[in-house]
Design a protein with these regions (language model features):
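Structured, solvent-exposed acidic/aromatic patches
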Residues: 7, 18, 22-25, 29-35
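Mobile gating loops/cap/lid regions near enzyme active sites that modulate substrate access
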Residues: 30-43, 47, 58-141
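Structural recognition of the beta-strand scaffold that forms the well-ordered cores
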Residues: 10, 16-21, 66-69, 136, ...
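Extracytoplasmic/secreted proteins, especially bacterial periplasmic and envelope-associated proteins
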Residues: 3-4, 40, 47, 51, ...
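A structural motif corresponding to the C-terminal end of an alpha-helix
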Residues: 4-18, 48-68
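Terminal and linker regions of secretory-pathway proteins
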Residues: 129, 145-165
Length: 165
């Protein structure tokens, strides 16, 4: 990834480049389930994310790139969800059973990409009572629209702090 940023983005003249790490996979609903079954495997998920961050930062040392710590942003939001308008940070908003029905059984794992499986009918795969704006996770690993908004709000603050906006 750092090689791509150096060789394909910076080398071609990009002036405003920000790199994000990945949030801690163990902090997601699926990661929490893995931790409950096997703390060793759950810890490996965190190590994976930390290693990615290390390699990415190391590969960009000395480059004109601003670093955005998505892992820290997610940790902050998950530590005080109400401050960010979230009412649920443990259960995915998308309902795997509904998505399986909507896709004719083609999608059975609840992957958020298919939460809106019916064209023209937004978010038809939501769990009863779920709100994609106040439930942080869409599926076991990915943020909901509200989760991504929280991330983008924090990224925007950092871009302003960099003087880019």
């Amino acid at each position: 990834m750092s090689g791509y940023i150096r060789n394909e983005i910076l080398a071609k003249g990009a002036k405003y480049v920000a790199a994000l790490n990945i949030p801690d996979p163990a902090a997601t609903p699926e990661g929490a389930a893995v931790m409950a079954m096997s703390p060793v495997v759950g810890a490996a998920l965190t190590t994976f994310a930390d290693t990615f961050k290390l390699w990415l930062r190391e590969g960009l040392t000395g480059q004109p790139v601003q670093w955005i710590d998505a892992k820290a942003i997610f940790a902050t939001v998950l530590a005080d969800p109400a401050a960010y308008g979230f009412t649920n940070i443990t259960v995915p908003a998308c309902d795997a059973e509904k998505m399986a029905l909507l896709t004719g059984g083609l999608v059975t794992d609840g992957f958020a990409l298919f939460c809106n499986a019916t064209p023209g009918s937004p978010l038809t795969g939501l769990r009863v009572g779920a709100d994609a704006d106040t439930w942080f996770f869409a599926d076991g690993n990915h943020p909901s629209t509200g989760g991504f908004k929280a991330l983008s709000d924090e990224v925007l603050k950092q871009l302003k702090a960099f003087g880019w906006i």
